[in-house]
Amino acid sequence: RQIGIRSMDVHGAATPAEDNMALLMALMTYYNAVTQAIPTHCFLPYDERLRVLVSWIQQLEMESLGKNRAPDGSRIKGRTGQGIWGGHGNESQHSFYQWLREGTSCSSIDLCWCEKPGHRHADLHRVLIANAKAQAEALVTRDPAEPYFNAVSTLAVDELNAGRLGALMALYEHKTTMLGTLFGINPFDQPGVELGKKLSRSAEADIL
């Protein structure tokens, strides 16, 4: 996994802006959150092995970017980090996809899949990937007469191994730190979390 992380570190530091994956993702997110005022981002992995990334990305981005003050304490005007949610893509088609397709709000969306399956059933995997691609098209082609729309991106990994997983996680980490710069916030502290800890210690003292 460290090899994959290192390769993404090098890519993020040395690749020109027009081909820099983390920067492009950060710029798209900034545009969606600030210019388009899209309040949430939905991560939809179409691979059982990537299911846990939903909660991981949620913690990464919301703890890092869920702030309304700059490092100097001044209040930031406008939006910052989005609310992150999601679920396994195939399962979620029977729960919240209806809301994504026809609800009275909108979300930016990442659909992620692996081209090579992690099992022997290649025929079933082809059906899954075809379904993911079809859903990506369906989610982005909402009725143009409606005032709500989704901003949809797809991420395809050739095969999932430790190196690819490390690179994928590092990609989202770099995206998050770049967003901190764009929003003008420090992504490495969590004052809201610390306040909760402080209040819990006070409440515990009262109980004792």
Protein language model features and the residues they cover:
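A SIS-like phosphosugar-recognition module
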Residues: 1-208
